Every structure is written in structure tokens, then in C-alpha cells.
Amino acid sequence: MSNQKQNNRPRGPMGRGMRGGGEKAKDFKGTMKKLFNYIKPFKFTFLIGILCAVVSVCIMVIGPKIQGNIITEIAEGFMNKVQGNGGIDFDAIKKTCALLLAIYAMSTAFSYLQGWLMSGVSNKMGYQLRKEMNQKIDKLPLSYFDKNSHGDILSRFTNDVDTLVQSLNQSLSTMVSSIVQIIGFLVMMLSISWKMTLMALVVIPLSMILVMVVVKKSQRYFKAQQKSLGLVNGHIEEMYAAHTIVKAFNGEEDSLKSFKDYNNQLYTSAWKSQFLSGLMMPLTNLIGNIGYVGVCILGGYLTIHGEIAVGDIQSFITYTRNFTQPISQISQSMNMLQSTAAAAERVFEFLASEEEVAEVQNPVVFEDVQGQVTFENVCFGYDPNKIVINDFSMYIKPGQTTAIVGPTGAGKTTIVKLLMRFYELNAGSIYIDGHNITEYTRSGLRNMVGMVLQDAWLFEGSILENLRFGKPSATDDEVIQAAKAAHVDHFIHTLDHGYDTVLNESSSNISQGQRQLLTIARAFLADPKILILDEATSSVDTRTEVLIQKGMDELMKGRTSFVIAHRLSTIRDADNIIVMDHGDIVEVGSHDELMKRNGFYTKLYNAQFEEA
């Protein structure tokens, strides 16, 4: 087993190994700048959306003025009728009402078009982000997944991107419309009375100060909310995957306690952020209503002195009421942008994660791989400050079977992971056929090597599809031959649908031993020149082990093979046995040679039979 260093954070069923909440957004402006770079490819659609918003608002702001004209016409007509000088011109009023209806209909149409276009931009941006994240995850080293929980990574892919898309769509649409509305209303208000406009504008500085204070306070809570959501998702995901283990070890109480802690973190950050965001609307409305009262008093005074018409009062009151609304909407949009920035920051952190070392410019082309493997002074540590493989050197001839044995944590699995270049070396080199493995592309290197891990991983899909994963171009006959070599063909035929049997998620509809046999068959099908069997028989019973051991013996003929096994009886016929302890080679030789030395290997071997 690998002695991979675990980070200091708790992991496993009772610990998540994730970052805590409460962290303030590091760079709001920088994050938003990066975000808007993703809008550039859709800038034409974005600009058309803004234009639609401008047109919609420009048409809409005329409405209250026309309503005021209708009221003025009615008031003047009524006064004329009282004075005996005529009456109300209903034909003119009907035409004005029809014009008003047409104006509002056009404004609604442009507003809908603007919302549709903005929604398209934000969703395309979300699509692009998910695409880049999916490409990024294939470029990340395994060390990234050692340090970050699956739940947190999943939360970045789903919750954070969804939050980003939805909040950005709503905030952008609302903010563009609100800014244009403020300008339009201000122009119309000034056209009626600069004095009343000045009275109405008194409330703006108060509202802006309030918005800035609340936004500053709420920003860190929105970031904490997103991160706490990642904690909760990660814990639930792990509990679902390991629910049997949790129950077996009576860990329900600790699991519930951990969930309660994470849920409390989410609750605390969520209610604080929502409390602050909820304050903005009522407080800005209160300030707006105070200004509204002042406008009404001043408007009445100006009407009495003949400076404005009666209908202008109604128009201005409508503008005043509507003028405070976009200010409130902008404050809410700023609030949503905090949520956008918090989610975007986590997404960009993922996209900015350090990738695997770049591929070599002119890679070695492998044609006739012999399978000669050389480890030369290899040093490695999952944490650079804690070396787990110490100056490891070994030469393996083509076609040799090399067993790597040792107690748990000795570094056995680490060695083969380094051969596969899952991790980069701290020092030293590994060669295949005389070429440093860094001279090959990673895909080319891994095409040379077939690997069967202790954890038998199969995908949701048919057995045939899972076996073909080792060689997508394989024919049905080749798949069947590989299954026969792994002694799993008989089992497959006992299933109702044979090779077309669909494995469910986590392949729980077959046993662990059967899953292991299928992964071995998958490696057979790949027909690699170098074979790695990492505890390949550890999950099968003795009878099944005997069957697949025969198949593996046939498979390993003519191939360079690395076998990692706890059951030392399975590697007695290996050409070389490397005995490791704490990252060091303590003994090398054949089974008989090592037994004669009566050293560390002999103690391991005898200990197993004493246990048996």
C-alpha cells in the first residue's frame, strides 16, 4: 500500500480535509475583471442586450409624462366646463391612452429581449467555464486530489458555477436597466422642475453610503457561505460513499456531529449574509420615502404658485417613486455581485491550480518496447519536506517479474505510481528502454503499461464497455479471450444478459472479487509490454486467487511485470523480490535466496504462515 503523506487536516468519515469558511474574498476587482474577460467572446450579443435595455427604458420613462398630460387635460377640461368655456376632450385623451399603451408594450418587448440576450450570454459563459474546468481536471496532478476533497471539487463544478451564472445574469440585467432608468428618470425630472429634482436627489448620498457599508460587511459572509456549502456537500458525498463503513464502526454519532458542525457553519454564514442583504431594501426604501414626502410638499407649493401644472405633480411623483426603485435594485445587484465574486473566485482558484509538468517538446516515439526498466537514485515525497522513497535504485531486465513486498507504508505502491508518472520525482530518474520517462508523453508512457489496482474501479455501463476501456478498438472475440484469461468468462455467462449486463453506480450489483476479476481482464485486453499488479489478488478468495494466478502467470510471460502483494505465497516464482521498509530497499533476491539469508523477508514470510 502507498505510504502517501496525508495532509494535516482531518480526513475520512469524521473529518473532511477541506478549508474552513469565513475567509474574505481576496480580490473582488481582479475576480470581476477575469469574469468579464469571459464575456468578450459574446460582446456583440452583450452590447445588443444593453442597447435593448436602453431603448426599453427610454420608451418607458416617457410614460409618466404622458400620464401627467392626461391628468392635466382632464383637470383643465373640468375647470373649463365649470367656467362654461368648454369641457373635457375625450377624443384627445383616448388617443393619448392608446399611445401610452403602445409605449408600454414596446418597452416590455425590448425588456424581454434584453433579458433573453443577457441570459444567453451568462449561460454561454457558464458553459465555457465548465468546459475549461473539465479540461483542467485532466491536467491536474494527483497531488491536487490528495489535498482537496472530492466534495469540494464537485461543489466548484456545480454550486459555484450555477451561483455564478444565475447571480451574474440577474445582477447584470438589473444593473444595466437600473442605470439607464436613473439617467432617464433624472432627465425627465429636470424637465419638470429642477427644484423638485434637487429635493429628490438629497436621498441618493444617504442610499449610496448605506449600500457601501452593507456591501463591505456582507462580502466576506457570502464567501464563507459558498465555502461552507462545499464542506456540507463534501461530507454528504463521503458519508454516502462510506455509509457501510460508518455503520460497521458505529460512527453514526460522530458523523452526525461533524455534519452538525458543518451545517452550523453554513447556517451562520448564510443568515449573516442574508440578514445584511435583507437590510438594504427596507433601509433604502425608508430613505426613499422620506424624500418622497418632501417632493410631495414642494410640488404642492409650486403648483399653487403656478410654476408647474397639476399633471406634472403626478408625473414627478411617479418619477420619484420609480427613481428610488433602480437605486434599490442596484444595491441588490451589488449584493448579488458579492455572491458572484465569491463563487467566481473559487472557480478561478481551481482553474489557476498548478498543472502537471508540461510534456516534452519532441517526445520519444515508442515502437518496439522491450520493457527494460531502470530506477536510478530515485527520491520522492508527497510532501517535499518528508521523503518517503530514499535513493531507490533498481535495474529490471525485459520480461522479468519483479515483486515488491514490505509492510504497510513501506512505499511499494508509490514506486509503481512514479513509474506511471502520476507524480514527479524529487530527485533521480526512471528509464524505460534507456529513455527517461520524461522523454515520453504521459499518454504514450501509460499506453506501455497495464495496471490493476487494489481498488477495483469500474464505470457505470455494460461489462463489455468496461472491459473495452482497456482497448477501445477491441473486437468482441478479443474481449471474450481476455475474460477467459482472467477466468471471469464463466461468471459473465451466468448473468442474465452476459456481457451486456449493466453495472450500476459503484458496481454494487456484483461482488468485490468479481469486480477485481473484471479489472484484471481489462488489463489483459490492453496487452501491455509492462504490467503492474498492485495487490491484484487481495480482494478475492483463495479459490479465485488460484484461478487468476494461472492466468496472470500466462499473461506475464515475455512482459516486464511488477507485482505488489501482501500474500507472499503468490510471488514465490518472481525473478526478483525487492523488500522495502520505510522507503528503503532492505533486501533484493529471489524467494529462495532471501529465505536463506534469514533476514527481513524471512520474518515477513514466516509471520504470514504463523498467522495462517
Q: What function would you assign to each model-found segment?
A:
Residues 2, 46-110, 190-195, 306-310:
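Transmembrane helix-loop-helix hairpins at lipid-water interfaces of multipass membrane proteins
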Residues 119, 228, 251, 275, ...:
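Cytosolic ends of transmembrane helices, especially the final helix of ABC transmembrane type-1 domains
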